[in-house]
């Protein structure tokens, strides 16, 4: 995109100027619609989520044995929801905004196997591929006890095949560790933003890590090229994969069950607001889709991005989706939130979900570090920087009278609200790395 076009874009969409200036912005989409109207544009439905959920249950006996840490949840890869009242009080004081209702944290940061939200989609897509191959050759049928996949026969079978993926870190961790456990040969193409400890962990599991000096887009492209040259290589496409998307979407029905168990009501009088950090969009898009199907129009999903990588906000706001990258408007895509360092959004997710996502906001690296330290000090929970992007969501919603009026949020409905921050990663960060992050937070 040339300079003239950027000038035209700025005139057409004044918010773009603020993005270029790396300002923290918040935009509530006026074109958001009901689930009934928005769902047909997704191209997927509740039945697709049920199929994904059933598949994960089939794999549960295998996962329990392959990864004993999944035993507590009977082989399901799931995380707890916790209240964070001290953090809520700290946010109210710091930003001088009363946050009505309850502030909670969804600890995908502590998901078993790979310690991030990517354990949902990444592991699911590997399992789908493994099941497909094994059923096609008659080694497996859906009625079998899937723990048989641990046998030498299956490992030998999967060794004929390889898997490739491009990643800033967490998706590569999930896909790499799951693929290697099954017996696949796996290559993870990692962008310049990827943390060293993530590369080392993958290598320790026998994963081939290919490093790039460029950003996420280049890593994905190279992974795709590798797969094209080898008929036995399966490429997992973070930008366009409906399978990944469905792996994330199962989180909706699971959260509904958790809320039922906790006695948390979500209905017209008790709205739910969910704040999701966003990179390329697959993880938050899939989770938001699942939440919408589970809770209908009573859940409001809001995406959070770094000021240096606001790709989804830029794509949806301008309507250009994956036809524009942040670099096209002079933004460098360099952020400490490595999992969110994406310059070009998923066109599939942007177009599928734009009518169902209430809003988007950006947050600086400095603020993410500050929130990281605050959460650690107040609640004793340690996350990686990108996982804190969602923490400002309740402040934005509570401070926007315009948005509250549009949603007809009365004082009573606000008081009954649940605000859920989706913590996307950090549970497996090595101690030295976490200490360095905490030092940057000033704590």
UniProtKB/Swiss-Prot annotation:
It catalyses: D-serine = pyruvate + NH4(+). The modification N6-(pyridoxal phosphate)lysine is found at residue 118. Disulfide bonds: none annotated. Keywords: Lyase, Pyridoxal phosphate. The keyword Transferase does not apply. It is an enzyme of class 4 (lyase). One of its GO terms (molecular function) is D-serine ammonia-lyase activity. The keyword Lyase applies. Its cofactor is pyridoxal 5'-phosphate. One of its GO terms (biological process) is D-serine catabolic process. Its EC number is 4.3.1.18. PANTHER family: D-SERINE DEHYDRATASE, THREONINE DEHYDRATASE, MITOCHONDRIAL-RELATED. Belongs to the serine/threonine dehydratase family. DsdA subfamily. This is Probable D-serine dehydratase.
């Amino acid at each position: 995109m040339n300079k003239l076009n950027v000038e035209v874009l700025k005139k057409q969409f004044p918010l773009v100027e603020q993005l270029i200036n790396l300002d923290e912005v918040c935009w509530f989409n006026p074109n958001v619609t009901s689930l009934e109207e928005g769902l047909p544009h997704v191209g997927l439905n509740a039945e697709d989520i049920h199929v994904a959920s059933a598949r994960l249950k089939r794999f549960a006996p295998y996962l329990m044995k392959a990864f004993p840490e999944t035993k507590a949840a009977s082989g399901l890869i799931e995380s707890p929801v916790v209240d964070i009242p001290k953090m809520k009080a700290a946010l109210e004081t710091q930003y001088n905004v009363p946050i009505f209702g309850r502030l909670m944290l969804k600890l995908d940061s502590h998901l078993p196997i790979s310690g991030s939200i990517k354990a949902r989609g990444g592991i699911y897509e590997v399992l789908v591929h493994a099941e497909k191959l094994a059923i096609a050759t008659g080694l497996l049928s859906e009625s079998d006890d899937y723990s048989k996949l641990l046998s030498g026969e299956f490992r030998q079978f999967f060794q004929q095949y390889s898997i490739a993926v491009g990643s800033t870190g967490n998706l590569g961790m999930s896909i790499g560790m799951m693929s290697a456990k099954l017996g696949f040969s796996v290559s993870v193409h990692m962008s310049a933003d990827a943390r060293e400890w993530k590369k080392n962990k993958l290598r320790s599991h026998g994963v081939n890590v290919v490093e790039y000096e460029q950003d996420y887009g280049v890593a994905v492209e190279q992974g795709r090229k590798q797969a094209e040259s080898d008929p036995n290589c399966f490429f997992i496409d973070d930008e366009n994969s409906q399978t990944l998307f469905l792996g994330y979407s199962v989180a909706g029905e699971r959260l509904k069950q958790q809320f039922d168990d906790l006695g948390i009501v979500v209905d017209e009088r008790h709205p739910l607001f969910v704040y999701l950090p966003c990179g390329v969009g697959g993880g938050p898009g899939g989770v938001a889709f699942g939440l919408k199907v589970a809770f209908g129009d009573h859940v409001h999903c809001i995406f959070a991005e770094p000021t240096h990588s606001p790709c989804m906000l830029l794509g949806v706001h301008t309507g250009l989706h994956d036809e524009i990258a942040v670099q096209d408007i002079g933004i460098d895509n360099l952020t400490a939130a490595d999992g969110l360092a994406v310059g070009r959004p998923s066109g599939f997710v942007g177009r599928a979900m734009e009518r169902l996502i209430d809003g988007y906001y950006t947050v600086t690296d400095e603020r993410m570090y500050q929130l990281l330290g605050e959460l650690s000090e107040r609640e004793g929970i340690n996350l990686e920087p990108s996982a804190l992007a969602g923490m400002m969501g309740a402040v934005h919603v509570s401070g926007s009278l315009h948005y509250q009026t549009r949603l007809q949020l009365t004082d009573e409905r606000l008081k009954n609200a649940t605000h859920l921050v989706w913590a996307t990663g950090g549970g497996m960060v090595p101690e030295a790395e976490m200490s360095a992050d905490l030092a940057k937070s000033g704590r």
